[in-house]
């Protein structure tokens, strides 16, 4: 910074402290300007908070959001593009119903068929929710972000510049500088005042565009709920048909089988041909004790030890959401390999991501993880 510029900054700082501590009077702007400043400050807070709350509305699970942010950050660091979509609750429930409906068997179970129908409906609702997310991000969140990073940023820049030039002007007047210096400072002060006023006015008088964005948001929500209502109406009719089908089916008769029906052949404890219990042979060996033998108990331990894990070589403090903190010598359970440099693991009931260079793998993950 040149000496003249440094001197100007010192003078402005001196004027600021004189006004705050010494009671000096600075140039006062009118009430209309101060009201525009207040509304602009509220708009800055509104845009920041509205973006945050809208994202939480679309993706309410904070753990899933943190995991997505961590994966996105790791992908940027590693230079690898990684597919990363928010797990819609409708989709998770749909997957559960579809999986177990097919396991039960749709051929013989109306309940299994109903589960599959319900799962397919929820899957459609999850797809509709993804469309809602894309619509809101494109037509509501992106304009807000543009407003925050361009319009508001420009207005706040003019306001900051206005404050600096006002201090410079008042400092030159207080110190009774040369007339041409005071006039030059006054001209710059007036120029910044004009730019700040026009910028704030244009921002605050743009209601048409802002309300249009709210209309788009409301229309997207209406379309989402309308499509979901159509899906649920069809599902309700289908499930009522399945209920009627289940009620009209004849009830199957079931006769439990006996040991004789199973053609068991052997010694004591069986049944005679007439169905009466046979006597236990005195030579028959006694039943084994239900107590677990030491050999069986010990056999469980190695399996537990074979769980993929690693030992921390150093302390790790997270820098991003979703990362896992741990201390040196902690034993961390390995859950997944994110890429060549990062793991996903768990320790002390917490899960998250951590760099491979901070740990020594003791039991590696199976191939493919």
From Swiss-Prot:
Residues 305-364 form the SH3 domain. InterPro entries: AH/BAR_dom_sf (IPR027267), BAR_dom (IPR004148), Endophilin_A_SH3 (IPR035824), Endophilin_SH3RF (IPR050384), SH3-like_dom_sf (IPR036028), SH3_domain (IPR001452). PROSITE patterns: BAR (PS51021), SH3 (PS50002). Keywords: Coiled coil, Cytoplasm, Endocytosis, Membrane, Phosphoprotein, SH3 domain. Residues 227-247 form a coiled coil. Disruption phenotype: Dramatic impairment of clathrin-mediated endocytosis, severe defects in motility and death at the early L2 larval stage. Belongs to the endophilin family. Required presynaptically at the neuromuscular junction. Implicated in synaptic vesicle endocytosis. This is Endophilin-A. It comes from Drosophila melanogaster.
């Amino acid at each position: 910074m040149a000496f003249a510029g440094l001197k100007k900054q010192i003078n402005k700082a001196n004027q600021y402290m004189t006004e705050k501590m010494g009671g000096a009077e600075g140039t006062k702007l009118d009430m209309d300007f101060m009201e525009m400043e207040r509304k602009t400050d509220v708009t800055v807070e509104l845009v920041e908070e509205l973006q945050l709350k809208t994202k939480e509305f679309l993706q309410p699970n904070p753990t899933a959001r943190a995991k997505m942010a961590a994966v996105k950050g790791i992908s940027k660091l590693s230079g690898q593009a990684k597919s990363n979509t928010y797990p819609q609750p409708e989709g998770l429930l749909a997957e559960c119903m579809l999986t177990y409906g097919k396991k039960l068997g749709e051929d013989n179970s109306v309940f299994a068929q109903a589960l599959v129908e319900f799962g397919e409906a929820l899957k459609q609702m999850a797809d509709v929710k993804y469309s809602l997310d894309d619509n809101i991000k494109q037509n509501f969140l992106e304009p807000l972000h543009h407003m925050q990073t361009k319009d508001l940023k420009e207005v706040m820049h003019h306001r900051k510049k206005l404050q600096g030039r006002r201090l410079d002007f008042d400092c030159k007047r207080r110190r009774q500088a040369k007339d041409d210096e005071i006039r030059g400072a006054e001209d710059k002060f007036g120029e910044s005042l004009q730019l700040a006023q026009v910028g704030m006015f244009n921002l605050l008088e743009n209601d048409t565009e802002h309300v249009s964005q709210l209309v788009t948001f409301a229309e997207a929500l209406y379309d989402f709920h309308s499509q979901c209502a159509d899906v649920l109406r069809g599902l309700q009719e289908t499930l009522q048909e399945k209920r009627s089908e289940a009620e009209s089916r004849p009830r199957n008769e079931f006769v439990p089988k006996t040991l004789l029906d199973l053609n068991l052949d052997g010694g004591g404890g069986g049944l005679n041909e007439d169905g009466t219990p046979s006597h236990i042979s005195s030579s028959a060996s006694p039943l084994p004790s239900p107590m677990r033998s030491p050999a069986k108990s010990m056999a469980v331990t190695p399996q537990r030890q074979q769980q993929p894990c690693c030992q921390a070589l150093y302390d790790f403090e997270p820098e991003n959401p979703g990362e896992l903190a741990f201390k040196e010598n902690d034993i961390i359970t390995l859950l997944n390999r994110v890429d060549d440099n990062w793991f996903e693991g768990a320790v002390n009931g917490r899960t998250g991501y951590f760099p491979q260079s901070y740990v020594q793998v003791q039991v590696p993950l199976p191939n493919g993880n």
